[in-house]
Regions:
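Long, charge-rich low-complexity segments
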Residues: 316-319
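P-loop NTPase signaling cores
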Residues: 2-56, 60-63, 70-314
């Protein structure tokens, strides 16, 4: 990612503050070149590396494994369907505050990380990705602003600290808050309150919170537009499987077996990105399509156990 691209992004996202920034040209240039741009660049690269236990220490890049997911919102007379294969500006048509809520394994975190990339690649908005668990520091909940200043220590130096606060008030950024359901229960209310207070301050920015469904979370973000992730189609699931051709495990062989063994359990697996990936993991271990859930999870367990041992020195395993 080139600095020129980020500078263009900065310019595109700050039209409302151009006059104000002209008066602070020196500080603005200092902030862009020495503070914000390096931070965004670093996060852009870091978020693209998969941290999934399925690809332990393999360095697989998320944008190479990603199959476009589709968000949908339905409420009374409102309806919106958005395929996320570029920056999804349409999800903010109804509100600048969005809640992405779905079950485990539907790809919420991956989706947020891809939206981060698209925001930069499409020169749409300057993004910030925040794991909500990280707002808990030294057993206390900190404000989003304090978290950003702590996470990016260089922001604390003048003129960056004051300028950051001013830019937050004047400009349109994108804040992606991940894992609301993963926050420890005793901190949840305070963490969610911190996000809402911040959202009110960053009046021009777009806010996205991703979570599994919980009553407390839904009520805490009641004024956010709720989006869910559509199930994968069979074609999308097969496209995902084809991206997971590791070692000598050919995805087409698995796909052929799935097509030849109609089974409701397998069809259910294919609707969920994580279960689709685990299906490949199970198949890579046994070369058999698990037609029962018990067999499926047993094969996954053994495959991951072998994968763990394969990282140890002297282990020799051929898939």
């Amino acid at each position: 990612m080139q600095e020129k691209l980020l500078l263009e992004l900065m310019k595109a996202c700050t039209p409302s503050a151009i006059k104000w920034l002209k008066e602070k040209k020196e500080e603005y240039e200092h902030f862009c070149s020495n503070k914000l741009l390096p931070s965004v660049t670093s996060q852009y690269k870091k978020l693209n590396v998969s941290t999934s236990m399925l690809f332990r220490n393999q360095g697989y890049e998320i944008d190479h494994l990603y199959v476009p997911l589709t968000l949908h919102h339905e409420h009374k007379l409102e309806k919106k369907i958005v395929r996320v294969d570029q920056y999804p500006s349409d999800i903010f048509d109804l509100s600048r505050k969005v809640l992405i809520c779905d079950s485990a394994g539907m790809g919420k975190s991956t989706l947020l990380k891809m939206i981060y990339r698209y925001a930069i690649d499409d020169i749409a908005q300057i993004p910030f990705y925040i794991d909500l668990k990280s707002l808990i520091h030294n057993e206390k909940v900190e404000s989003v602003e304090d978290h950003l200043l702590r996470t990016f220590p260089s922001f604390n130096e003048t003129p960056s600290k004051g300028l950051f606060t001013q830019l937050l008030e004047h400009n349109k950024y994108l804040f992606l808050f991940d894992g609301a359901d993963e926050v420890a229960d005793k901190y949840k209310e305070e963490v969610f309150r911190s996000v809402n207070v911040f959202s009110d301050k960053a009046k021009s920015s777009s806010i996205v919170v991703a979570t599994r469904e919980e009553d407390l979370i839904l009520s805490s973000f009641y004024d956010f537009r709720l989006f869910k992730i559509k199930n994968l189609t069979k074609d999308c699931a097969f496209a995902l499987l084809r991206k997971y051709e590791f070692k000598d495990c050919v995805a087409e062989n698995l796909i052929d077996e799935i097509e030849n063994n109609a089974n409701k359990t397998i069809e259910e697996f294919l609707k969920n990105p994580l279960l689709t990936t685990l299906l490949y993991t199970a198949y890579s271990y046994s070369r058999q399509v698990p037609l029962k859930k018990s067999l499926f999870y047993k094969q996954v367990y053994h495959a991951l156990y072998e994968n763990h041992d394969a990282t140890k020195q002297g282990f020799n395993f051929s898939c």
